Regions:
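NAD(P)-binding Rossmann-fold cofactor-contacting core
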Residues: 25-62
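Beta-loop-alpha module in the N-terminal Rossmann-like domain of NAD(P)-dependent dehydrogenases
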Residues: 72-102, 112-118
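Rossmann-fold NAD(P)-binding glycine/threonine-rich loop
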Residues: 92-94, 98, 111-150
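Conserved anion/nucleotide-ligand pocket segment
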Residues: 148-211, 215
Length: 307
């Protein structure tokens, strides 16, 4: 049985959730499947050999039972097989690139690094004959990249989604509790750990923009420039706008939208009627609605914010 040596880069909310999944669900992870995911190629076992972080002492104190795993040192090429990159900054792009250049496969959840690389990381993986996967970077638990990639923009005419579970939680709370202000709802989401260290990434619509950019790339093979995507965050919504929406039996959602027929891309708060498939997607859930040339409208939904 083949044994794969894993290195985790980053140990924030997502990193901790991945570590827990790898350790508690070990018996359910059987092996490696082929590219079409319909055949088990190899039975494997794995070891987490190190967790690379910036502040070793912080994590060793908080997670003393695995203190030996934390390090600031990059592992030598001979000591690992797969890099799992889970940092939340653009610096993750350098980690991905170095691992690929060292002949390692990479799994990443870093939408910022992937989007800002504008396809360079995918090209680097191809150049070195390595695998780069990042399904977890977009739409939480929804396997949307696997669905969009083989279809392309020729068959997908319109894509609309709630791609940021944090802002969806905030908006849901505003419509649940009439006493809650926009500012209070943002503070509540931050306390629950739903928001990025810089909340502007979420409430300003940047996080959803990066994710939409990745989806557009999967459909078209090209990353749109940030200036090509209209962006308006939920931080522009007022308490009065929320009250007016409630009185009209409508709701606001931060919707990421790609219209492949017109080439218009945007991330904006949209006022939705109850007939909209995204209307009832509440809490920290994500959802994506695809309008397909032959299949019509298809909506997928799953957990979003947090680990």
């Amino acid at each position: 049985m083949k044994k794969i040596r894993l290195v985790l880069f980053g140990f924030g909310t997502v990193g901790q959730a991945v570590y827990e999944l790898l350790t508690t669900e070990r018996s359910r992870i059987l092996g490696v499947v082929n590219q079409s995911a319909d055949q088990l190629q190899d039975k494997v076992d794995y070891d987490i050999v190190s967790i690379v972080v910036r502040d070793v002492e912080k994590y060793q104190a908080e997670f003393s039972y695995i203190s030996h795993l934390f390090t600031t040192e990059w592992p030598s090429e001979a000591d690992y097989d797969l890099a799992i990159e889970l940092v939340s900054s653009a610096a993750g792009g350098d980690i991905i690139a170095q691992a690929l250049e060292s002949g390692k496969d990479v799994v990443s959840a870093n939408k910022l690094a992937l989007y800002q690389s504008a396809g360079q990381l995918e090209a680097l993986a191809n150049e070195h004959g390595r695998i780069l996967r990042y399904e977890g970077a977009v739409a939480g638990a929804i396997p949307i990249l696997q669905i969009i990639s083989p279809l392309g923009s020729g068959e997908i005419q319109l894509m609309r989604g709630i791609l940021n579970g944090s802002t969806n939680y905030i908006l849901t709370r505003l419509f649940e509790d009439s006493e809650l202000s926009v500012e209070d709802a943002i503070a509540e989401a931050s306390k629950k750990g739903y928001l990025e260290a810089d909340p502007t990434l979420d409430v300003g619509g940047f996080d959803a923009l990066y994710k939409l950019g990745i989806l557009i790339y999967m459909a078209t093979g090209q990353y749109p420039a940030e200036s090509d995507i209209e962006r308006i965050g939920i931080d522009t919504l007022t308490d009065e706008a929320i009250a007016e929406a409630k009185s009209a039996n409508k709701t606001y959602k931060l919707v990421a939208e790609a219209d492949f027929k017109t080439g218009r891309y945007r991330v904006t708060p949209q006022l939705l009627a109850s007939t909209d498939p995204l209307y009832g997607v509440d809490g920290s859930l994500n959802a994506v609605t695809l309008t397909h040339q032959y299949a019509g409208e298809l909506t997928l939904q799953g957990p979003g914010a947090g680990g």
